């Protein structure tokens, strides 16, 4: 009962923090960048314009935008509200997943979900129309993975089957929105492996076989999508033609080396650069009054986070849960593998994370970034230092999104 209370407390904290970060100025938001041409085409041609725009590379996006346009029309505000809700729900799905994997780790799960939800490396939240599919896709991916964990941990076969079916369907749904999010399947596989390895006394062969058998039903999501994408769907856009992009590896031996270099660069970008450079490039454009408001908002949100973390603390339980070095390795490897998995599809189609213009490519990897940073911070012995680091990262995020 106490753990359930903590979960709902963490959920409320996530809701409060994310609302303070994304909603204060939402009523004044309009169309930005590619939002303009998307909405102009829809205004002139109706919902069929969405099909014409995305039929060449991501036709599934029409399944989202057509109903939203029928509901909201040309008014930008509802799109910004739904973009925020999908962002928050993505954070909730990550929180739910980490809660099941580490039920006694309130600090770790809460900090990871907050850092993910307000991650400063994604700078296109205000492009709520063009990036609606990105944000929804990320939420659906994390919800699919949450159902995977529920299926594996479910006590009854019937419940396990229902969660498995739901997970597969959501897997197809998120891939229909954004194909390069497929890197999050590494997160799913890493979780399955982690749960299998918690069973002691098994050989490598037994662990490998068990992992494969437990993961295989969920492989229907990426497997089915790849069959459709590679052998059935015909794309007219080279940038999203998987075969053409990966085929470059065989045209020159240097391509693979450059991919490795870009992977290392982008790992540094999502882990370190995202917490400084975007704010640095944007903040200097603000007026003094906006800067002061940003500092005030950042201080207020940090205060709320610190109070919330102190409310949920249980030193004895947390210390006991983190004393096992195996669990520590679990979190580090889970975060690191998720970062690599999130970046690989981006690298393989010859894209690169550049702030602020191509910050969207950091979205899948941001899941691993949040997990890894939360795990590192949690291991610090000094509670004051832990809170200071969390406060700093939250403040940077608040200031970046405010700017």
List where the protein language model places each region.
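Polytopic membrane enzymes that build or remodel cell-surface glycoconjugates and lipids
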Residues: 1-403
């Amino acid at each position: 009962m106490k753990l359930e209370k903590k979960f709902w407390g963490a959920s409320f904290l996530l809701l409060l923090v994310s609302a303070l970060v994304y909603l204060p100025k939402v009523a004044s938001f309009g169309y930005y960048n590619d939002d303009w041409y998307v909405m102009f085409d829809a205004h002139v041609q109706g919902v069929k314009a969405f099909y014409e725009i995305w039929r060449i590379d991501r036709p599934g996006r029409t399944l989202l935008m057509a109903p939203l346009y029928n509901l909201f029309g040309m008014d930008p505000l509802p799109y910004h509200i739904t973009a925020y809700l999908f962002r928050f729900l993505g954070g909730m799905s990550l929180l739910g997943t980490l809660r099941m994997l580490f039920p006694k780790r309130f600090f770790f799960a809460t900090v990871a979900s907050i850092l993910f939800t307000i991650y400063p490396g994604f700078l296109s939240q205000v492009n709520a129309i063009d990036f609606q599919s990105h944000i929804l896709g990320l939420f659906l991916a994390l919800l699919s993975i949450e159902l995977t964990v529920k299926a594996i941990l479910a006590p009854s076969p019937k419940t396990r089957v229902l969660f498995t079916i739901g997970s597969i369907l959501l897997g197809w749904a998120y891939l229909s929105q954004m194909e390069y999010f497929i890197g999050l399947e590494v997160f799913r596989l890493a979780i399955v492996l982690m749960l299998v390895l918690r069973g002691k006394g098994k050989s490598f062969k037994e662990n490998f076989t068990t992992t494969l058998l437990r993961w295989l039903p969920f492989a229907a999501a990426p497997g089915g999508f790849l069959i459709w994408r590679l052998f059935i769907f015909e794309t007219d856009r080279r940038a999203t033609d998987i075969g053409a992009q990966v085929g470059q590896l065989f045209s020159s031996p240097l391509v693979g080396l450059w991919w490795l270099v870009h992977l290392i660069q982008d790992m540094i970008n999502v882990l370190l650069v995202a917490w400084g450079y975007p704010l640095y490039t944007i903040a200097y454009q603000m007026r003094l009054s906006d800067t002061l408001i940003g500092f005030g908002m950042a201080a207020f949100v940090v205060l709320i986070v610190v109070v919330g973390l102190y409310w949920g603390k249980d030193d004895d339980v947390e210390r006991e849960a983190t004393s096992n070095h195996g669990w520590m390795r679990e979190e580090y490897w889970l975060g690191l593998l998720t970062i690599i998995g999130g970046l690989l599809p981006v690298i393989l189609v010859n894209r690169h994370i550049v702030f602020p213009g191509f910050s969207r490519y950091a979205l899948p990897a941001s899941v691993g970034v949040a997990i890894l940073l939360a795990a590192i911070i949690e291991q610090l012995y000094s509670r004051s230092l832990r809170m200071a680091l969390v406060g700093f990262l939250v403040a940077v995020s608040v200031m970046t999104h405010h700017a």
